[in-house]
Amino acid sequence: MSKLPGNKLAEETSPYLQQHAQNPVEWYPWGEQALTLAREQNKPILLSIGYSACHWCHVMAHESFEDASIAAVMNQHFINIKVDREERPDIDQIYQTAHSMMSQRSGGWPLTVFLTPQQTPYFTGTYFPKTARYQLPGFAELLPRVAAYFHERKDELATQSVQLAEALARTIPVANHLVSANENTIRLAFDQLEANFDYTHGGFGTAPKFPNPADITLLLHQAHDGNKPAEEMALQTLSAMAAGGIYDQIGGGFCRYSVDERWNIPHFEKMLYDNGQLLSLYADGYQLSRNKEEKAVYAQVVAETIAWMQREMLSAQGAIHSSLDADSLDVHGHSEEGAFYVWQPAEVKALLSPAEFVVASRCFGFDRAPNFESQAWHAYMAVMPEVQDQLLLQSAKAKLLEAQGLRTRPGLDDKILTSWNALAAKGLARAGIVFERSDWVVLAQKTVDFIREYLWVKNAAGNFQLMATAKGEKVHLNAYLDDHAFLLDTLITLLQASYRSVDMQFAEEIAEALLGNFEAESGGFYFTSHQHEQLIHRAKQPYDNATPSGNGIATVALQRLGHILGEARYLQSAERSLQAFDNVIKKNPAGCASLTYALQEYLNPPTLVILRGEAAKLTSWRIALKNYYPHHIFIYLDESADKLPGTLRRNLLSNVNGWICKGVVCSKAITDIPSLLTQL
């Protein structure tokens, strides 16, 4: 089918936008062409925000955007703009916040926003059915009413625009002139998490259940500091997710969230950002746990999740694709959520030996009532396998995975996002450190090398700048705060896995970009750079969501790099960030867990441990330092380490030497492992 006239999406990098390129709707990507057209024609804008793995986005597209009669109304009354929220999180953040303010409801996707030509929203919603149902108005009847409101209520819209601008401005926290949050604030964070903890099933709140990686990270850190309840909460949650259906028991990797409180039935989309963060968490949990069976489960989760990434998500260039769709074709050729992942017992029985079927049925719940829409079975760990059954279960999983591979696969969103690749690379690096897997570290390095080679580009002024996304030969969109913050954090982790001078240089360049392009005068960092296009609001977000707060991670990473290099400017910038968000952290430290951890390292700076020696001799030191040390930075410098900054420069001697540094003071050289462990 040829491209429809007026639809401008076919050349976009986003698979989500490309999915709508053949709609009868005259879609435009967000940009000056569409915005100018709205102003010139005095038409309202219909802004539709979603992403390719979103189930309800597909439903609304099929019901409304593929319908010629609906499209005709949209084209008559509106300038229609389609946005991929993964490529344009800046736009998504603004209008999700506006939707929450205007409707007093939480947002989500698809997000449907009607804007004035000046980009101010005047009516918002999420999914709208074609005809009225679910207590929602029908899209067909809604469109002309919303268009008429724009033309007939100009005075009301002007007043509403001013009120919204003022409300958005109030979301920027008022900075303090000092950091008054303290150890009591960190204890309050635990109290807030504990109050919302599900002691029966792990995790926080009720259904739907999300992994909340930033919360678990904070609990793991507090567990290391002797908080036993925090340890129990973190490990119970990790174990419950590993046993649940939110984790793909057959193919590895985690789905976005669980629709039930027991973690058993997921929303089936698989997102890179979840899996990258969870790799780090399960590696940390493995180090912290003292339970042999628990450690074995965490190790298996890490290995299987990385295998899934390599098998289904890795690009030929070494970067990692974004997501897998929740929907796929079932045996009848119908697009259904979860079709790729669910089973029928008869199908399983035909694929396995009798002994394998008995074990798999018992362990994965195939011998129980159907748990997915009352007609299919989704595997979860109903019963842990006995020791003698583990090999049978592994062989059953291998056969089921092979059979699953013959099904129609979920759609792959194959764009490369800098921020998500950074999260994945950190997870790979942490796993490589913990499990002594140099091949996983190499995967992390290749991911970062891709970012440095393809997404770190010279601009018109001849300066390097980071870009947000790539697909094929096209690299575009100025990178956001999260891209820079997550990448800097990842580079610091990689330096601990295997020191490379190119990574240290890149870390310094990204840190300078953060300070030069994102820092606010009052402290903290804007989500968009100083060179970014002007939108109706410039966000400065302290709170963690599915991904951690860019402000929190930037603050942690700048502090850590500042201590490694002895660079006061980085430490001062981090302090200004904590001052900027001081009131927010004191009021809701659990809601901004990443900033709370930054506060913890501000109050008690991390210990830098420098180890210099030949690679072969450093191995025993690495093994001895395998415990969980979240407040330490370990830098191993073998004979290949070159171009060292002054703070790390040490002579290479015949035996390994170590130094423990706090602030600007380092210990005398330590020449044996027991002495080092004693001083830690």
Residue ranges and their predicted role:
Residues M1-G427, A431-V434, L578-L680:
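Replace the tail clause
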Residues G50-C57, F254, N275-L278, L428, ...:
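Extended, hydrophobic alpha-helical segments in both membrane/secreted and soluble proteins
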Residues L220, H224, A283, Q287, ...:
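Tandem alpha-helical RNA-recognition repeat domains
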Residues A240-Y247, K446-V457:
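Glycine-rich, acidic and aromatic/proline-enriched surface loops and short helix-turn segments
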Residues N291, R311-A316, K458-A485, T490-G646:
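Long, polar/charge-rich, low-hydrophobicity segments
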